[in-house]
């Protein structure tokens, strides 16, 4: 019995103490996964991966669905081809060459298996398995699937090890055949998950499986496959709620079919919004069926959807330093990367009323767009709740004030290119400068996005990527195996703020000797800054080049520091202070009206009122209604309610 009241985080931590923590994931698992239920050939698949690279679309993991093995060529006397362990020579004549090709392209590979039918006589591994188990191979007796039989378990994993020798990195265990075994009460899915995960750690390899949820305690065996999804808005809308509430039982590393798997309908806006949710999901695995009309390649979609897809896939990879630090947090502290809003605010009723909104790590709050865009405003609407304090739009630095202790509810509107992502005042988010670089190594070039208005800190964790060094016990290894780069932000009410990056501590051998840093202060006004390294003002001998820039669109003041010794302490000062950027209300309202699908005369009247009255213009916007009185009357006016809503967000946000 767990009686914790509303102390949700404490309850989940204690549950994991009893049932086991969520293990640390390998770095590549946090990047983009390409998956499709499709009969690829070796040439076709490698060509596809090559095009992704040419188009600048980054992936770290390739998922080969069940058609890697014999399916339709199985003699009916053996049953169906649903279970299989023999590569299809028509599609993959040289499996090792194929898997080597994926590795050369920087991809780790998993393949799909349905183990229920055991190992049958048509399979290449059959003779060896039959000898191990002791069945009559001459009579072609099947090696029955039986996890309670130690001989079968030996034959089963010997077969998998032989296949892994060609280059398979981990297995997608797609069990769908119920929970019955020879031993009453023993769930085969549970045993499969346990055995495969433990086996995947042999020889010092980083353990990983990809399988279905087998009940409480399954957090010990990441990653979770949530099953086939239907391509509908309703299905998309369910996923944020599903993911965040799974954290209530400590299960954090979910992989959904991003973009939807089957049935449903084509809706390009839906696909873009699903991609955007995927970028802020625990695992971002694109997936689709074998239908020739449902491929998820971004070039299959029209602009601006195509660009939105590519941008958000790059964003996911760029977030790797942040994601990997949250990976360590999940393994050591027991906090899943996605959590419902009420975990941090259990006594505030409003935090329970936003099922589509969630925290993404320590620094971000995400409210994905899960309903179709309004055609008048050309924007998707999301109802969000922000706890007390100042918040900033992660992408453009606009400030949102929530002064009341109970927080603030508001409707926010976003174009097809992004979703609402907020960072609280003082937030610090480290990112990888080049989302197309090797995701398995610690990056040389980093961007750090810093938000004003309050003090903040962030401890970025990096490791060698070698499981032998990092070790299975993340809590024990965190000091010896990781390098920790501490970042602190002292706001000082903007009078004399300073941002500091300390020299890394711990296992500093895993950090590049020199780094390029881009420090981005978002949501601020222009200001002078001074950079100090190792206690001295920066000079040419310490760094290659220093560049300062200001982007008015995102209200971002940035400094680029090239070729900085990793052992240096970096300090950024603002001798003249640093102010919050003024809210560009008129410019943002003009953009909304420019995009709006409505009468030009109404746009002009609305903009005139906003320019003259500011926030006081809101009541008057609903009076801009005039019907055409006769055929010669060219003046008419109509103000869509959705456009008023989008304008209200801008006028009232701070």
Language-model region placement:
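A short local loop/turn or secondary-structure capping micro-motif enriched for an aromatic residue
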Residues: 375-376, 401-403, 408-412, 431, ...
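Proteolytic-maturation and junctional protease-sensitive modules
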Residues: 384, 388-402, 521-549
